[in-house]
């Protein structure tokens, strides 16, 4: 029976070590999530500044407007890629945590079964010790999960706003180009009329509407 207890204790220690390793990975993931949150906040501030400069941007050349849209698209794609990587890491850590929890419950069950013929005080003390360590790891994983979900929601909301604003800018740019084209045509027609009136050899152009009315 002592061999069984020793084996169970060794397995429990191994599980604790694995939990510590995953705890380190979770800390790294939390740091990445914090960095992503800071970048999201920076993008929000950038969006507010861009909205304040919308009036000025309308009078800028089309190339400047297109360049700004391209830069925003690159930033959105980069954030979406990082968000996807963080989602994948979160799923991997959750799967690993579920596996460790399953192994831990199995070991504790074996330990409790073996404790029927051994000192229950030692077994309960060991159980409490490992339960505290496991609970600490679970709390950190839950904290990481909450931060990740908040970052994902913020990123999705910001991405939708950026997408709608880009669509509006593209529509506005299209209207401005149409107005510019109409202005160019009107200017050319006016220039032709002025040239015809100032030319001494130009023959008078009959008024088609007037001829039709007389007929």
UniProtKB/Swiss-Prot annotation:
Region (Disordered): 193-215
A cellular component term, taken from the record's GO annotations: cytoplasm
GO BP terms, alphabetized: response to wounding
Coiled-coil boundaries: 12-186
UniProt keyword annotations, A-Z: Coiled coil, Cytoplasm
Superkingdom of origin: Eukaryota
Family membership: Belongs to the SIKE family.
Protein name: FGFR1 oncogene partner 2 homolog
Organism, as annotated: Xenopus laevis
Lineage: Eukaryota, Metazoa, Chordata, Craniata, Vertebrata
